[in-house]
């Protein structure tokens, strides 16, 4: 089902070069912080599997590994994985993230979260589907094609997706909101976009 959380503080996304990485990063960190929702045992180290060692995947692995999560990175490019192993405190598995045998090597059955962020939407969705079937508790798929993304609402349950992330669409929506409320220092959205809470600066003179 859909998890009870929202991506927070989106305006900061505008200041990062790799917007997709940052959006996925905030999503993953928010999910990982909701341990009470996941019924985790206190003190249990959370296992996160990242599929795709591109700009997004590497940034996620670097950030989450510094926060002491048990991170496994999957990619078919062994050269990239060697670089990741040399520079990060993570485990790596070489292979296609949509291959069930590769996911089993990464111990997907004990994963609290699987994040598929390759450059191919189809691979990301299929990887998440297989990951859930093999026991991953939650999954996030990076879906950039707007046609695919519009169908996610219909397919989310069948694909067993906890969340689909479209970086470009989220940033475009945020820019639009900032243009509508240019004086707001912060904007929060509730009730699936039907309600917005604004934080506005007030001068001493009112």
Residue positions per predicted region:
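Cationic, amphipathic, low-complexity segments that mediate targeting or membrane/lipid association
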Residues: 2-4, 10, 14
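Cytosolic regulatory regions of ion transport systems
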Residues: 15-18, 22, 36-206
